[in-house]
């Protein structure tokens, strides 16, 4: 990703779609980030079980992960994952959807581009058991001023 020198922080959030609304399951805090360029890598099989995040930039290298005992029984379910594949304009303080993952026992899955994060009702139409999303947000505010 490429930013300007006014960036102060970044936030990576994982959501689960519940009753037509996105509910945060991990993230919400943020971290100081003041480099104009960097790389973000995400590692996961299914988002119900967790996520690994790695960030690399001129002054910032690190990784973090969260894994949880899933309350959701996904045994035998299939999943479809959509990822952001094109360059995206970064607008400060606006979430950018990176990944949408549908986990379901249904035989047919309608997968959408990640921009459908902003239209969760599309996923509700098909009554999938689980839908998850990962977003990133860059801000000119320090971490202490980010909304949680």
Where are these regions (language model features)?
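Acidic, Ser/Thr/Pro
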Residues: 33-45, 86, 90, 123-126, ...
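Glycine-rich, aromatic-bearing surface loops/beta-hairpins
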Residues: 94-148
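Intrinsically disordered, low-complexity segments enriched in Gly and acidic/Ser/Thr residues
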Residues: 63-102
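Structured domain cores in non-transmembrane regions
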Residues: 4-78
């Amino acid at each position: 990703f490429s930013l300007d020198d006014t960036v102060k922080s970044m936030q990576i959030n994982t959501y689960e779609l519940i009753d037509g609304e996105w509910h945060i399951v991990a993230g919400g805090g943020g971290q100081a980030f003041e480099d104009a360029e960097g790389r973000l890598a995400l590692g996961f099989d299914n988002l119900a079980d967790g996520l690994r995040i790695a960030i690399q930039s001129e002054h910032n290298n690190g990784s973090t992960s969260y894994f949880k005992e899933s309350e959701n029984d996904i045994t035998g379910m299939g999943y479809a994952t959509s990822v952001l594949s094109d360059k995206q304009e970064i607008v400060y303080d606006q979430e950018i959807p990176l990944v949408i993952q549908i986990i379901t026992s249904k035989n047919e899955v309608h997968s959408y581009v990640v921009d459908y994060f902003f239209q969760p009702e599309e996923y509700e139409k098909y009554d999938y058991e689980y839908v998850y999303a990962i977003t990133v947000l860059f801000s000119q505010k320090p971490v202490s001023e980010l909304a949680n």
